[in-house]
Amino acid sequence: MKIRLACLLLIVLNLILSSSENAGAKKLKFKACAKPLPLQLKPFTNQPQQIDYLCGNTGCFKNAANDKQNAQKNNLCAATEVITPVTLKTFSDLNHASNNEPSIPKGEPPASRAKLANIISLPQGKTLGEGKVVSFVGYVLDARHSNVDKDNPLTAGNGESVQCNLLGCAYNDIHITLAEDGNEKKLCNTIVAEIIPHYRPPAWDLFDSPDYAKFFKTHPVKITGQLFFDGSHVPCTAEGKAGNNPARDNAKDFERLALWEIHPIYAIEVCKFDDQTKCNSAKAWLPFSELKKWLGLSTVTPSDKCKATIDNPSSKCPGFKLPN
C-alpha cells in the first residue's frame, strides 16, 4: 500500500513539474517551414534566435500590402531544386519589367504580388521572378547591420517594420551592397542582398566585421537566396542618379540598380582566389562560415555598433509587448 501511494505521489509530482515547464516554455512567433531550412541554413532548422520568439513573419503591422511584403522578406521556404545564376543584366531586365507593370505602384508595396512571380522570360521557356532562388557572383562593396544607430544601437533609431521595429544588431538585417566589379564607384551599378536575423547562423552575424573587410575587397563572393521585390523604394533613374520616392515626399532614395534583391540569403560562399577567372571550379569556393578558420583568425570582432546586445530589446512598433 505504501509503495502504491509513493508511486502515485511521484506520478502527480511529475505531472505538476511537466505542466510548470510547459507553462514557462518560450513560444516561437516566427513560423519557419514544414521542411528543413534551405541550403546552408539547414543545420540551424532547430536553432531559433531570440527574435524568433519576439517577432512573427509579418513584423509590425502597417497595412495589408506591407504585411505581404514583410512575409516575403522573411520567406525561408523557397524551393532550391533549381537555382538560376543571375547577373547585373538580369537585375536590369527585372527592373525594366517591374517599372512597366501597371499594377505595381512607385515607392509602395503592391497590393498584389502575383505579377512579380514570373515577370521576365528566360531561354527554353523558363521564367524568373519573386520567390525563385538565384545566385549572384560579385564583390562586397559594403556590408552593415541596417536600421541600427551607430552611437546608441540599443536605444536610438526606429528599427524596421519587418523585424517589429526592434532595436539592436541581433534583431535587424545585414544589408550587403554587391557589384560585378570590385572597383565599382557608381552605386547605381550595384544590387542589394540581405541576411535576415531569423534563424541567422552565428558566423553570418559577423559578416560585416572589419576583420573581413580587406578580404572582401579582393575576393569574389557567391550569394544564393530568394529573389525579392522591395516595393518601398525606387531605383536609380535611367541617367544613373538616385530616384525620387513619391511615397516619401519625393525624397531621394538610396542608389541601386533595381528594386530586386536577394532576400533572404540562403547560402554565402567566398572564393579562395583574388582572380575571378580562377573561381570557375567548385573547389575554389568556401562556405563563408569556414572563412575565419581559413584565414587563420583566432577571433572575429563585431562592428562597433554590434558589440552590445540584449535579450529584451526595445521596439518602436505601436502596441508591441515583450512576452512574459
Ranges and model annotations:
Residues 16-18, 277:
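Hydrophobic alpha-helical segments
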Residues 1-5:
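Positively charged n-region of N-terminal signal peptides that target proteins for export
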Residues 7-16:
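Bacterial N-terminal signal peptides
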Residues 26-324:
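OB-fold and OB-like single-stranded nucleic-acid-recognition modules
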Residues 19, 23-25:
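Boundary at the C-terminal end of the N-terminal hydrophobic targeting segment
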